[in-house]
UniProtKB/Swiss-Prot annotation:
Final heterodimeric neurohormone released at the end of the molting cycle, involved in the sclerotization (tanning) of the insect cuticle, melanization and wing spreading. InterPro entries: Bursicon_suB, Cystine-knot_cytokine. It comes from the Eukaryota. It is found in: Secreted. Residues 28-123 form the CTCK domain. It comes from Bombyx mori (Silk moth). This is Partner of bursicon. The keyword Disulfide bond applies. The keyword S-adenosyl-L-methionine does not apply. GO terms for molecular function: G protein-coupled receptor binding; neuropeptide hormone activity.
Length: 137
């Protein structure tokens, strides 16, 4: 009898935790961040022609998503988990310019043709909460 009361009390506490956690506000959003990008250019023989780098402002997904744990008689652990992660909903492609370009000897290019390099990258345009591990979307 005492064990049964303890189990019921535990499940009530667990239910309270699940309900209070799942009612929290989701705040998955697109946030600007700085990353260091390096791109190398090679000729047909595989020799390095130039190496360019720069700090680039890009979007990333950041925030919290509601996740839940439910008691379950069918699960071996006794609980069913539903986890959600903040991930990209849409990606957009854009060009960025790298402004620090060097020859294979490490000497910085001064001529306009070699001093800059355009690089195409993809970044999140919009973020959303998705079931963790679900890559089918």
């Amino acid at each position: 009898m005492n064990i049964m009361i303890t189990k019921i009390f535990f499940l009530v506490q667990l239910f309270y935790i699940v309900v209070s956690k799942s009612s929290a506000e989701e705040n998955c959003e697109t946030v600007a961040s700085e990353v260091h990008v390096t791109k190398e250019e090679y000729d047909e023989m595989g020799r390095l022609l130039r190496s360019c780098s720069g700090e680039v402002s890009v979007n990333k997904c950041e925030g919290m998503c509601n996740s839940q744990v439910h008691p379950s008689i069918s699960s071996p652990t006794g609980f069913q988990k539903e986890c959600f992660c903040c991930r990209e909903k849409f990606l957009r492609e854009r060009l960025v310019t790298l402004t620090h370009c060097y020859d294979p000897d490490g000497i910085r290019f001064e001529d306009e043709e070699n001093a800059l390099m355009e690089v195409r990258l993809r970044e999140p345009d919009e973020c959303e909460c998705y079931k963790c591990g679900d890559f089918s979307r």
